[in-house]
Design a protein with these regions (language model features):
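Active-site acidic carboxylates
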Residues: 1-87, 102-103, 165-166
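A structural signal for isolated positions on well-ordered beta-strands in alpha/beta enzyme cores
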Residues: 5, 51-53, 112-114, 137-139
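Structural recognition of alpha->loop->beta junctions
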Residues: 75-88, 148-174
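Internal catalytic-core helix/loop-beta-alpha segment
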Residues: 77-121
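Short phosphate-binding/catalytic loops that engage adenosine nucleotides
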Residues: 110, 135-136, 165
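A short glycine-rich beta-strand->turn/loop micro-motif centered on a GG-aromatic cluster
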Residues: 114-117, 136-150
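Short Gly/Thr/Asp-enriched flexible loops that form oxyanion-binding sites at enzyme active sites
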Residues: 124-134
Length: 174
C-alpha cells in the first residue's frame, strides 16, 4: 500500500517574509492533498492514503530571538490552511529528528512525501536529504518552497534532484 503525506515545513510567523509569495500555492497544495485523500478513501483505501502534516521549528538555543517555544513567532502563519492535527515540532533542521513525526511515519506506514515550506537552503534541504537517505520517495513542490535568499532557489532545486528527489510544480501533480 502506498501511503503518502504532504509535509509543510516551518511556515511560521518568524520565517522569511518570502513565504507570502508562496502561501497561495501552499494552500492550493493542501487542498490538492485533501482531494487526493478523499479520492483514495473513496477507492476503499486499497490504493493507500494521504496525510497532511505541518512541521514547526522550535529554537531552544539560549539567547535566541526567533522560533522561541510558546512565542507568537513559532506559531504557524495565520494565512495557512490548517486542516489536520498532525503538527509536529522539531528542534533541528531535519524534520525526521522529531520523534513524534518519525513515530507518525511508522504508525501510518508512510513511504512517499510531497514537501513544501521553508527554508529551501536549510530545513527543507536537510529534511529532503534525510528522507531520501532513509529510502523514502520525495517530491519537492518547486512552487511551494522559498528561502531567505531567493537567488539560491534554482541551485536548491537542482540539489534536490541530484539527491534523487522529484522536483515539479504543484500543477504537474494535479
Amino acid at each position: 500500500m502506498k501511503t503518502k503525506a504532504l509535509v509543510v515545513i516551518d511556515i511560521q510567523n518568524d520565517i522569511t517574509k518570502h513565504y507570502r509569495d508562496i502561501i497561495g500555492n501552499i494552500n492550493a497544495a493542501i487542498e490538492w492533498a485533501l482531494a487526493e485523500r478523499l479520492r483514495l478513501e473513496k477507492d476503499g483505501n486499497a490504493c493507500g492514503s494521504m496525510h497532511i502534516v505541518y512541521i514547526k521549528h522550535n529554537n531552544t538555543t539560549a539567547g535566541t530571538r526567533t522560533f522561541k517555544p510558546g512565542s507568537k513567532g513559532e506559531e504557524l502563519v495565520p494565512e495557512m490552511k490548517v486542516v489536520s492535527d498532525n503538527i509536529f515540532v522539531k528542534a533541528k533542521s531535519n524534520a525526521l529528528t522529531s520523534e513524534a513525526f518519525s513515530a507518525f511515519i511508522t504508525a501510518n506506514d508512510i513511504n512517499e512525501f510531497y514537501v513544501a515550506g521553508a527554508d529551501a537552503t536549510a530545513c527543507v534541504k536537510s529534511t529532503c536529504f534525510n528522507m531520501r537517505k532513509a529510502g523514502f520517495m520525495v517530491h519537492v513542490l518547486s512552487d511551494c518552497v522559498t528561502s531567505y535568499d531567493l537567488k539560491k532557489l534554482p541551485e536548491m532545486l537542482a540539489y534536490y534532484e541530484s539527491k534523487g528527489c522529484e522536483v515539479k510544480t504543484l500543477a504537474e501533480y494535479q
